[in-house]
């Protein structure tokens, strides 16, 4: 059995060399402490938006490679594979193989394998000492099957919102190096303001799998007054900020994109079926100011590091995970903007609270068939 006390040997020196931020060093220290107890083999790092979880993962991988161990890093979507590889290479990790059909970086012998959960579901999973699961709250079946079958492997989960039902039945422990409030206070995340011009009436919308029915929610949000309010509020208060908009479903998000275009605002639409080339083009146009409002449903809730200073939330939800993920897309500090402006047309901030007030200290241990108190399962991206 691998000696977990020495798995990350040399991390203190690496932390100084790479100038990790204090909360990143603390994340590695807490992880070492948890795994060092002996009984914990599956540990989640609760890593708020902006904590730098990819860099933290890089240091974990470096420590594992120093001991001659193989690592699998799983991403929640194929679209995130290349940026993950680039991030690892930027920190000096070169022995990387990508598990994806016809990918130029395919190398089964590489010590570090990067794969999407969709690919893992169709492939034989290679041997590894450590599996790092990004966005582990999404609870991919292939990962959880591996967790129950591979008792010789250590699993490290990464998530800003590890609050999904039943996670505590699979994972042994969760460590929390910092909170969103901590990162805002220390200047690593942006201050934010919330303006809620509309509170949609959701009383007649049924609940499915712990969240509002998507189609019924879209009907509520497609009302003429609400549709007009979204555009008018941004024109009055949005200050022409680079903006991400979240719609209730694809049709609703497309309608809002068209409404912004009619108002003379450069807009783009992106969903799970937008190919990687078009998505890269949208990102480039967004970064250089050619697109002011990028509309989606859930595609842009994770793995997006765009220079956003306004969030339009037009998608009511009961999910604190989804709520925090959406607002988190705009909390990174951007040059030239003082804060994040949240235009909440969904009533989510009033219903669920401000993201600085939402926090969990333990993993949920709700048994199958029982109702979790306040959380629905977030959907995996379609790829």
Identify the meaning behind each predicted range:
Residues 116-123, 139, 272-364:
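Conserved RecA-like P-loop NTPase helicase motor core
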């Amino acid at each position: 059995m691998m000696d977990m006390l020495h798995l990350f040997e040399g991390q203190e020196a690496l932390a100084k060399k790479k100038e990790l931020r204090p909360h990143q060093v603390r994340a590695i220290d807490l992880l070492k402490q948890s795994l060092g107890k002996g009984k914990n083999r599956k540990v989640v790092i609760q890593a708020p938006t902006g904590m730098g979880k990819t860099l933290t993962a890089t240091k974990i991988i470096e420590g594992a490679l120093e001991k001659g161990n193989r690592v699998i890093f799983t991403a929640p979507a194929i679209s995130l594979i290349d940026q993950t590889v680039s991030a690892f290479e930027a920190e000096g990790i070169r022995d990387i193989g990508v598990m994806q059909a016809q990918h130029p970086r395919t190398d089964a012998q590489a010590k570090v394998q990067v794969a999407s959960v969709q690919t893992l579901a169709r492939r034989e999973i290679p041997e590894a000492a450590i599996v790092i699961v990004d966005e582990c709250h999404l609870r991919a079946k292939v990962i959880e099957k591996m967790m129950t079958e591979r008792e010789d492997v250590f699993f490290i989960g990464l998530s800003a919102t590890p609050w999904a039902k039943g996670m505590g039945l699979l994972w042994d422990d969760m460590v929390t190096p910092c909170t969103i409030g901590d990162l805002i206070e220390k200047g690593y995340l942006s201050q934010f303001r919330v303006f809620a011009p509309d509170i949609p009436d959701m009383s007649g919308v049924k609940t499915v799998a712990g969240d509002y029915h998507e189609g019924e929610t879209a009907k509520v949000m497609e009302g003429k007054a609400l549709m007009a309010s979204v555009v008018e509020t941004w024109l009055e208060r949005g200050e022409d900020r680079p903006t991400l908009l979240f719609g209730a479903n694809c049709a609703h998000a497309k309608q809002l994109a068209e409404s912004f275009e009619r108002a003379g605002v450069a807009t783009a639409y992106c969903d799970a079926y937008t190919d990687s080339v078009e998505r890269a083009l949208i990102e480039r146009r967004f970064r250089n100011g050619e697109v002011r409002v990028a509309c989606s449903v859930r595609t842009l809730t994770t793995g997006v590091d765009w220079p956003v200073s306004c969030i339009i939330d037009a998608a009511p939800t009961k999910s604190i995970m989804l709520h925090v993920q959406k607002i988190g897309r705009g909390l990174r500090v951007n040059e030239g903007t003082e804060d994040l402006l949240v235009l909440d047309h969904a009533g989510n901030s009033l219903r669920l609270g401000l993201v600085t007030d939402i926090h969990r200290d333990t993993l949920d241990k709700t048994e199958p068939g029982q109702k979790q108190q306040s959380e629905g399962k977030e959907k995996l991206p379609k790829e």
